[in-house]
Amino acid sequence: MTIKTDVLIIGSGAAGLTAALNLAESHKVAVIAKGALGDSASARAQGGIAAVLEEGDSFEAHVNDTMIAGAGLNDVYVVEHVVEAAPRAIGHLIDLGVPFASENGALHLTR
């Protein structure tokens, strides 16, 4: 079987599918995965997405926690960017219809 595409994305995790969604507006995109599209490490992680979404939480705390979890090997500028972009990314995923866990009509937030 031959498939013609502008962009081939290998992997159906969060990064691959985000790239596919963004590129699909202007390119013909194909996604391939070694298993079912929903069978990625991202889908199996079930740990949620770390983001500052409520009062009393802070970007600084998330950056610090991430740096500690990464044994200080993380690029602090990348960590800061990801933490700052996370609330917008979650909003975008909600707009796309991603079914996040919720309680009483609000996102389920855990610590």
Model-flagged regions — what are they?
Residues 2-5:
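Core beta-strand elements of the Rossmann-like FAD/NAD(P) dinucleotide-binding domain
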Residues 7-31:
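N-terminal Rossmann-like FAD-binding beta1-loop-alpha1 element of flavoenzymes
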Residues 34-111:
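Conserved N-terminal/central alpha/beta ligand/cofactor-binding core
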